[in-house]
């Protein structure tokens, strides 16, 4: 402990709490622009702050999709006006061939990654042309892929032949993870020039098909891409985390309103508010260690995208800090949810551990259930790639 007699220095007593580098979520869908009845940069960033996330990266499948430099510039400007936490963006690859736009954006430094959909998901961004995919891998920086089943093999091959790095989003099954493990063990496929990064989401760790099949309502609510898998798959994914084959936990925060989910088959669920709590509960049960949690949620995401001043608690680093109560027992209720969609698949769940405080660029934006009073007028978030 250090005593600061200078009244200008704010002191926060965090004894007994877990203090870690701010959580970085590399996989969100903030629905802004075009789908802001589901979420927007203001409400989504508040959900992040409540969940302990100090930096989010947003995916390009909005309306319109982020497949031009102009669209990306507009998203950056909108987020800068309202975001409670730091933000970055993945540029989108288009089936209509936007190679020149990809070159321009990656070259300018506005984005360091390109998202490629190799399977169908929300938005019309599926790319099946192998020649076009090869060009995207050549110029797209770190390529984030939505790839399922055999498409993972294809993405790994494209990265080895043409790419500069491959980030495989939301791996959901034992079969897919075994494919990734095999590739990571092969130095011809996974090396410094062509690295492979593996992401797993909390919902693929803690939800399974048995839960979805429990009722007609659950069968509508618990739908996403990739779909939930068997309980044996969730166990294998957790073991892969412990074995060091998983690099990050990404939420794939993809909210839809409750009415939309119950009215028609709609893929995606909210996750920003609950990801840390779910992982803390896993740590409390002995499934993972707290140092591993910090590596998956803070250190590795920063390193993967070259955020050299984030992901660490050190002199000169950005003052992005997540503080958690690791022993508190609590239950999630609908009244607790701040995401605009207003619901969570984890309502009624009992947790051990939750976010206590979120500090963004030295500003306390969330503390023990309350947001900073001036968060709307003075948003704390900054664009992570200052040009």
Language-model region placement:
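C-terminal cap of metal-dependent C-N hydrolases
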Residues: 315-384
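Divalent metal-binding segments
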Residues: 29-39, 54-69, 89-100, 117-126, ...
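Histidine/acidic residue-rich metal-binding segments in metalloenzymes
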Residues: 100-249
């Amino acid at each position: 402990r250090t005593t600061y007699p200078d009244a200008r220095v704010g002191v926060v007593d965090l004894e007994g709490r877990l203090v870690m580098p701010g959580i970085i979520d590399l996989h969100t869908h903030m629905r802004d622009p075009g789908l802001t009845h589901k979420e927007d940069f203001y409400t989504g960033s508040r959900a992040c702050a409540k969940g302990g996330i100090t930096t989010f990266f947003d995916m390009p499948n909005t309306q319109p999709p982020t497949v031009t430099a102009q669209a990306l510039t507009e998203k950056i400007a909108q987020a800068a006006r309202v975001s409670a936490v730091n933000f970055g963006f993945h540029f989108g690859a288009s089936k209509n061939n936007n190679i020149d736009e990809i070159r321009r954006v990656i070259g300018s430094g506005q984005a360091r990654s390109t998202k490629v959909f190799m399977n169908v998901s929300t938005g019309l961004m599926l790319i099946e042309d192998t020649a076009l995919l090869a060009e995207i891998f050549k110029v797209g920086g770190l390529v984030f892929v939505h790839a399922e089943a055999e498409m993972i093999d294809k993405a790994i091959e494209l990265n080895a032949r043409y790419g500069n790095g491959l980030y495989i989003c939301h791996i959901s099954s034992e079969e897919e993870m075994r494919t990734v493990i095999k590739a990571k063990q092969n130095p011809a496929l996974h090396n410094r020039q062509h690295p492979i990064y593996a992401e797993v989401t909390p919902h693929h760790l803690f939800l399974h098909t048995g839960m979805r099949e429990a009722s007609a309502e659950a069968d509508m609510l618990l739908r996403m891409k990739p779909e939930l898998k068997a309980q044996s798959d969730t166990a294998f994914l957790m073991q892969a985390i412990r074995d060091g084959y998983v690099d990050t936990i990404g939420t794939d925060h993809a909210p839809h309103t409750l009415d939309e989910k119950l009215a028609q088959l709609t893929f995606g669920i909210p996750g920003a508010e609950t990801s840390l709590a779910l992982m803390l509960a896993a740590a409390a049960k002995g499934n993972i260690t707290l140092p591993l949690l910090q590596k998956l949620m803070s250190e590795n995401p920063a390193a993967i995208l070259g955020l050299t001043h984030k992901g660490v608690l050190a002199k000169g680093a950005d003052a992005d800090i997540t503080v958690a109560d690791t022993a508190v027992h609590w239950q999630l209720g609908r009244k607790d949810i701040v995401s605009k969609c207003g619901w969570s698949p984890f309502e009624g769940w009992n947790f051990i551990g939750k976010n206590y405080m979120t500090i963004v660029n030295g500003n306390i934006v969330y503390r023990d259930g309350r947001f900073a009073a001036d968060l709307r007028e003075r948003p704390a978030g900054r664009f992570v790639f200052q040009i």
